[in-house]
Amino acid sequence: MNPALKALGLGNFKLPSRNWTIFWTVLAGSLGGVGYDKYQQRQIISRYCDEVKPLSLQHCDVNKSPRKITVFIAPPPNDYLETSLKIWRRYIKPVLYYAGLDYEVIEEDRQGIIRSEVASRIRQLRRELLEADNEQQGNSGDSLLSIFKKPHAKDPEEEQKFDPEQARQFKADFDFRNVMGIYTKVPKLDTIVQTDSLVADPVLAGGVVCVGRGAYKEYITGLHEGLLGPLDPPEETTQEVEMGSKLKSMNDGDNVETTVETAVETMVETTLESADKVEVEGKDTENEEGKDEPDEEKSRVLKPYLLRTAFHDTPIPPEVEPVLEKDALLKDPKTNVPSLLHQPVLVIPVPNLIGFLTIPERIYRFYQRRFFVDEVCREASNLVKQEHIVKYEPDKHINLALEEESDWPKQWVKTGIEKNSEWTQELVQDQRVVSKMHVFELPKHTTKDTKE
């Protein structure tokens, strides 16, 4: 025994036993693999953030808003929304933040919200276009008719009448700096101009990010519904049809009036019972906040205006005919920003395996997470720099993030097919609509070289 170790009171060093050696080796390897993967993830995110950081240092006038990205996030099937939000918050949002870009996030807690949101935005643009066209025609008509009109004296009582709409408009437009003139210390800013409205090529305006295959499916369907569908929702005729069926089943004769009265009384009693039930439930939940909407209201809000089976047979509405048949642009009349139809799309898959039998694959993916992070951050960097934008190819880009569907639970897919779920249905696309779209697509060799 070494005398020095003996003087210190230390015994002889011995190698650990076989079992302890196996234990510490497995533990060190497991923890080392996790630590290395997490370290590489931080390095990857930091590298791509540093690449786009110079863009945020560019000069921007105070009356201009930065480029705005629209983000649609959908949860993976049979799982929580937080799974998709982690991908957004950890890997996509930092790149957009350090690039100095603005973004708007639309989250979905049930199927149909993204489709309904996209379609409603397109319909709102169509309504504004129709209103602007009508106002222009009305103003031109007034200018022509004003030549034949003679000026007449105004009634003093009419001049003194109070117009609440005019008062609200005056209050909104009033600014003390216009009254004080040179005595104001803060100069008055001009109208805020969005950077997306100043680009020469509409493909370089804004951008759309779909996190999840389900979000991408609903986005495509929402574009078709908003452009080809009607402006007004389908009429709710459930109660009318029920009443009509009762009246049609009546027999002609002396009992017609009695039958009609009975049917009406039944409908009234049903309405009163439902109203009382709603009132009682409202009293019980009077002080609760964040209460979910009724199922009937949800289904009514998310009900499509146009079925996907009718996309190809639906004629193009006249207000969007120059957009779909010609090279005209669909822009917001107020901001002059190109619509979502012309903005390029980036699709990010959400890999998510659940179940006991998938544990080995989940463990492997857990230790290889850095490759997925590198791919997502590279796509986000390409979104910021706008380097690789290609025209939408129906046969190719309809399958974006298709690999995610292999992770969907088979039982969930089977149930979705039976219930006619939007995600399990085949994605329908019309050439008239998708021919105006663009997508972010990196070259294939770039991804391979990085992974190798």
Curated annotation (Swiss-Prot):
The keyword Mitochondrion applies. The keyword Membrane applies. Pfam families: Tim54 (PF11711). Residues 274-285 have a biased composition (Basic and acidic residues). It comes from the Eukaryota. GO terms for cellular component: TIM22 mitochondrial import inner membrane insertion complex. It is found in: Mitochondrion inner membrane. Residues 37-452 are mitochondrial intermembrane. Residues 1-19 are mitochondrial matrix. InterPro entries: Lipid_Phosphate_FormReg, Mt_import_IM_translocase_Tim54. GO terms for molecular function: protein transmembrane transporter activity. Residues 271-299 are annotated as: Disordered. GO terms for biological process: protein insertion into mitochondrial inner membrane. The chain crosses the membrane at residues 20-36. It is a single-pass membrane protein. Residues 286-296 have a biased composition (Acidic residues). Keywords: Membrane, Mitochondrion, Mitochondrion inner membrane, Protein transport, Translocation, Transmembrane, Transmembrane helix, Transport. Essential component of the TIM22 complex, a complex that mediates the import and insertion of multi-pass transmembrane proteins into the mitochondrial inner membrane. The TIM22 complex forms a twin-pore translocase that uses the membrane potential as external driving force. Component of the TIM22 complex, whose core is composed of TIM22 and TIM54, associated with the 70 kDa heterohexamer composed of TIM9 and TIM10 (or TIM8 and TIM13). Belongs to the TIM54 family. This is Mitochondrial import inner membrane translocase subunit TIM54. It comes from Candida glabrata (strain ATCC 2001 / BCRC 20586 / JCM 3761 / NBRC 0622 / NRRL Y-65 / CBS 138). The gene is TIM54.
